[in-house]
């Protein structure tokens, strides 16, 4: 990624669950720290899987983070001396996160975001599509399909070992007890109970 002088930019790391998004975010943030840059990291309060005040990858790597409930809370922090701003699990924030990321970049910050691009139904997971569109750099990572070992771009939600239904709630915070990576061929979304009754 080239540096733009006198302005910031947005980097977007995306892909399915278990593709290494948080790992890559942590790696980029640590590089900033090694370069003696001032780094601040934010994460959504809803994501309390591993630690309340840290971003933790599935591999166990971690970095301190500020826990926030809404994207607007980012702007309540003094970021005047900050070089790099990290934001994890962007899909859990409201669409306003896109405008906030743009504002931060326009003020000269390097904004590094990470989040799912698709929900468990393999549908675009807002606000990631919008954020990807306004980012200077987009990295889409692949996981490995839990069924066949092929590259995986989808996240399979499992409820008691069975595929989730299409009308289940979009947000269900979990890790390997509820989700696994799948390729296009092995990704399954069960019909709703209503659809089954109509058949």
Swiss-Prot record:
Binding site for Zn(2+): 145, 148, 183, 186
Residues that hold ATP according to the record: 15-22, 88-91
Record-annotated active site: 89 (proton acceptor)
Keyword terms: ATP-binding, Cytoplasm, DNA synthesis, Kinase, Metal-binding, Nucleotide-binding, Transferase, Zinc
InterPro entries: P-loop_NTPase, Thymidine_kinase, Thymidine_kinase_CS
One GO-annotated biological process of the protein: thymidine metabolic process
Record has Disulfide bond as a keyword: no
GO molecular function per UniProt: ATP binding; thymidine kinase activity; zinc ion binding
Assembly with partners or alone: Homotetramer.
Protein name listed in UniProt: Thymidine kinase
Record organism: Staphylococcus saprophyticus subsp. saprophyticus (strain ATCC 15305 / DSM 20229 / NCIMB 8711 / NCTC 7292 / S-41)
Gene: tdk
């Amino acid at each position: 990624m080239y540096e733009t002088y006198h302005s910031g930019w947005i980097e977007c790391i995306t892909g399915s669950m278990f593709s290494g998004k948080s790992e890559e975010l942590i790696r980029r943030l640590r590089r900033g720290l090694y370069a003696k840059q001032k780094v601040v990291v934010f994460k959504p309060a809803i994501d309390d899987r591993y630690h309340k005040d840290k971003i933790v990858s599935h591999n166990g790597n971690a970095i301190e983070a500020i826990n926030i409930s809404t994207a607007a809370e980012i702007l309540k922090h003094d970021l005047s001396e900050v070089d790099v701003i990290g934001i994890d699990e962007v899909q859990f924030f409201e669409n306003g996160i896109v405008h906030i990321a743009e504002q931060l970049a326009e003020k000269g910050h390097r904004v590094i975001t990470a989040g799912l691009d698709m929900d468990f139904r393999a549908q675009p997971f807002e606000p990631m599509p919008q954020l990807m569109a306004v980012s200077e750099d987009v990295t889409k990572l692949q996981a490995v399909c839990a069924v066949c070992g092929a590259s995986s771009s989808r996240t399979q939600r499992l409820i008691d070992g069975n595929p989730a239904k299409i009308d289940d709630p979009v947000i269900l915070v979990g890790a390997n007890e509820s989700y696994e990576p799948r390729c296009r061929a092995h990704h399954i979304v069960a019909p709703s109970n209503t659809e089954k009754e109509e058949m």
